[in-house]
């Protein structure tokens, strides 16, 4: 999905003996109680460590794509149309300030 398995938060690309590895992370979690959509606009390509930190609410994203809880800005391609609604949901319901 994103730049050949490169983490959109850290920029890390994990290479394994079986090839590159990254994880698809839902911005607004799917299933109850969050009911996020299982769509590309609700997915980030993350390293395993960043995936866990994002899911646990240690990291989130501002509307301008700057990161919260870690310094930096989300790496994104023009064709990856992220859901601002999902980003806002994560920040307001998952992120722990």
Question: What is the predicted function of each stretch?
Answer:
Residues 1-2, 12-97:
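A detector for short metal-coordination/catalytic motifs
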Residues 9:
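Acidic/histidine-rich
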């Amino acid at each position: 999905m994103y730049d050949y398995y490169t983490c959109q938060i850290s920029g890390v690309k994990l290479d394994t003996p079986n090839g590159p590895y990254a994880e698809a992370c839902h911005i607004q979690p799917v299933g109850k109680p969050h009911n996020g959509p299982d769509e590309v606009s609700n997915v980030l390509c993350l390293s395993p460590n960043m995936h866990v930190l994002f899911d646990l609410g240690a990291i989130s994203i501002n509307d301008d794509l700057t990161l919260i809880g870690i310094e930096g800005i989300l790496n994104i391609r023009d064709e990856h149309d992220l859901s601002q609604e999902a980003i806002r949901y994560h920040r307001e319901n998952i992120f722990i300030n």
